[in-house]
């Protein structure tokens, strides 16, 4: 097991900041004035081989493959002040405060509002099964949106969710977990301040999210992310609005392509007809005929 209890020296390494702890080195990038990257290097190799990122400030083994859709930027300017009890990295719009004992990282916006705070003793851990865990401070009435394709209510507060994509055909729209699309990104919205912040965990390994379902009175209320492999590699995206976070998240991972006009209409889709023992083509055509008889405009079927 590895647990980050205490922090040490914080160093300016040019394009990133290195944070020493008793357990593992962390690195912090100011990717832009509104996007931070916080990576805990449990594997120690700091390998960069992303297929997800369309904006980076570092070299990656996939740069040649992603040529034409990946933009290289210079890290945003920031100033480090390292002290005995804490370090401060001040950017144009974000400020990172690193408390050294107990160890935790906090992020503030330019108005001094707290956007993110780690939970001391829980934030950067590797358990006995080598799963890596990150815990973040939340409030009782926070809302959580995102996570890719999920069943149930849109707000995932007090939910526990697994991300292990598979063929979930015939799933229960209220309870089944997980479904097809694995996207470890979510937005936390504070009901009181109406401020939002985005969390993108840059990892394709199977993982799970506890969005305040677990409660321990030893610590402030928290959410947690646990991954079966890979580093804790968090991109923290400032808002304050949800619209701004989505814009910045898609700057980071890519924009959607422009859909054809037909995609704006009704598209029928079912595995039932193709898997019929016979006459599957006729069954598809019968479906189209039925939509016409019922006055349902159908633009396509797949």
Residue positions per predicted region:
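N-terminal accessory segment at the very beginning of proteins
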Residues: 1-271, 276-289, 300-301
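Anion (oxyanion) recognition and catalysis
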Residues: 292
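Short loop/turn motifs at secondary-structure junctions
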Residues: 295-297
